[in-house]
Structure formats: structure tokens, C-alpha cells
């Protein structure tokens, strides 16, 4: 099993993943909406979910407030596991962080100001946001 990642390691990995090819973002072109899983792509949180959850054919918009919807529609809730959390749904190496980290990472993914899609690159604002996140989450 891979070691648990720090907040900054997760931020760096996420930034590198989408900076290499912003088309990997799980965004519907004509609406700009983000979905956890869309046409083989995953949002920032969706990318870190365990295989069971990544395989869900659920078209939720990609933000942490919708995780509760995802939990309510799964078999854990049906067998009395209403206490399931985002942390439970993540691959083990991503577990152990507060939801605020995931909101921050998801917002990096979602914000169109951070991605120059016609030129397939990160914008100056996007890189600045990444640097701010790295400072804010250092040591966590």
C-alpha cells in the first residue's frame, strides 16, 4: 500500500495532473459544469475516490456538498451505514484530511479562471492559486 499523502502532496499531484493536460478536467464543455465522473474523466475529488466510487455512474456536480448525495445513493446507506464520509470513499493514501482541503482542491479544478482551455495550459491566476494553497496547507 502506498503511504498516506500530506495535504501538499495531494495538492501538488492534483495540480500536476491537470496542468499536464487541462482536458483531463471533468467539465462539460457547453455548460462549464463539473461532474465527478464524465466521459472517462474525473474531477479533483473523483480522481481520488476508491475504485468502487469511481465506477459509480453518478452524474453529480463535482463539489464536496454533493458527497452526501453520493452516500445516500449507495449500498452502504441501504445497510445502515449512513455514517459513511468522504474519507471512507477515498483511496487509502488520500485519507485523513479535513473536508476543507478537498473543497480547496475541488475549487482549483472547477474555477475556469485557472485554466486556459484554448491553449491547454494553466493560467497565471491558476498557478498563483496553486502557490497560495501550497503555503496555506504546508505542514498539514
Spans of model-derived segments:
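Catalytic phosphate/metal-binding cores of nucleic-acid and nucleotide-processing enzymes, i.e., regions
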Residues: 2-5, 17, 21-34, 48, ...
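Active-site nucleotide-donor binding segment shared across nucleotidyl transfer reactions
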Residues: 37
Amino acid at each position: 500500500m502506498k503511504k498516506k499523502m500530506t495535504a501538499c502532496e495531494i495538492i501538488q499531484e492534483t495540480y500536476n495532473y491537470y496542468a499536464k493536460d487541462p482536458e483531463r478536467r471533468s467539465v462539460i464543455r457547453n455548460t462549464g459544469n463539473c461532474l465527478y465522473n464524465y466521459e472517462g474523466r474525473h474531477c479533483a475529488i473523483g480522481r481520488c475516490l476508491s475504485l468502487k466510487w469511481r465506477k459509480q455512474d453518478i452524474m453529480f456536480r463535482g463539489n464536496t456538498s454533493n458527497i452526501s448525495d453520493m452516500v445516500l445513493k449507495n449500498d452502504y446507506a441501504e445497510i445502515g451505514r449512513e455514517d459513511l464520509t468522504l474519507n471512507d470513499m477515498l483511496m487509502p493514501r488520500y485519507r485523513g484530511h479535513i473536508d476543507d482541503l478537498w473543497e480547496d482542491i475541488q475549487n482549483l479544478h472547477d474555477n475556469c479562471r485557472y485554466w486556459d482551455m484554448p491553449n491547454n495550459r494553466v493560467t497565471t491566476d491558476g498557478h498563483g492559486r496553486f502557490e497560495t494553497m501550497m503555503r496555506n496547507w504546508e505542514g498539514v
